[in-house]
């Protein structure tokens, strides 16, 4: 079955909910059992209720480990990934920090991409040292062999990196990690399983901000982790011990969003490519940081891993503009909203202050002010027209009026 068909059907068993096309939303804190023995068996992963179909013995004695609605979504995510088992988390950042805390203990050392999501970097800088974990931030375009220490337990990868969108040499990182028995975790939110499957390349853990493309409608916050074998068992034990709980209604919405993922991603990619090519030719743009563009320095590496590109990229303007000037540019846009997320239906734009981001890749000679762009589902010509008008407002001589 092709991926677009799997997306529509994944995680749903019509016979389980009396022929209804859509699974019900279960609002229940308690699971009832016919006998005490049935309860004990459920706690040991042998429930009489068939709600988890990934073949792993999971506790189903109390709904803090998930209602059927939660498990329908986790089943669907594992099906789409094509391997492994899935766990659902309250947010993408929760999933990131949870993965780190599972595999990084006091006295251990972790490697994290220099251009990772800034909230992850903040967690690594502010929280991990308190727990006795040493952190090294690495350049994703360079050889990491010399950065490995005897106590390195985890390598975090992001595909591609946040804001600057560098592509990591994933096969190199995985090879080094396996030689030293180090766990690898890949944040694959930008690509989704449609464009790249981390587990197929030997990565131990695939991680997603379901908030973004997977759910796709800007109406929930959620994360997910997919792994297999002993790695999954370690994650699952921590999952139970930390008491991670997810709301059933959010899982229903995310599961519904998955069914249109293929169509949405195709639209995001086509629109982003059209907009990016137009921006490449604009006199006020020094660089377009979108690896799908043929002239991107890592285009060939990108092609070797990814089936396509999503709708999120950055641009570097021709010079550094003041905060007031950037406000003048984006405050008056008609279609693009000013927002920190991406992956929904609506296009978003956000100036990025490089000086506030303490990472070396941001110090590279990309040009002037950074702006991140997410192309939603609107018409590409309308988006180009909106961007053209916004760029025409630079430089803003009268920032009070924006004219």
Curated annotation (Swiss-Prot):
Keywords: Cell shape, Isomerase, Lyase, Peptidoglycan synthesis, Pyridoxal phosphate. It catalyses: L-alanine = D-alanine; L-glutamate = D-glutamate; L,L-cystathionine + H2O = L-homocysteine + pyruvate + NH4(+). Its cofactor is pyridoxal 5'-phosphate. The modification N6-(pyridoxal phosphate)lysine is found at residue 212. Pathway: Cell wall biogenesis; peptidoglycan biosynthesis. GO terms for molecular function: alanine racemase activity; cysteine-S-conjugate beta-lyase activity; glutamate racemase activity; pyridoxal phosphate binding. Its EC number is 5.1.1.1, 5.1.1.3. SUPFAM superfamilies: PLP-dependent transferases. One of its GO terms (biological process) is regulation of cell shape. It is an enzyme of class 5 (isomerase). Pyridoxal 5'-phosphate binds at residues 62-64, 92-93, 209-211. Belongs to the trans-sulfuration enzymes family. Homotetramer; dimer of active dimers. NCBIfam families: cysta_beta_ly_B. Catalyzes the racemization of L-alanine to D-alanine, and of L-glutamate to D-glutamate. The activity is low, but likely physiological since W.pipientis wMel lacks canonical alr and murI genes, while D-alanine and D-glutamate are essential components of peptidoglycan. This is L-alanine/L-glutamate racemase. It comes from Wolbachia pipientis wMel.
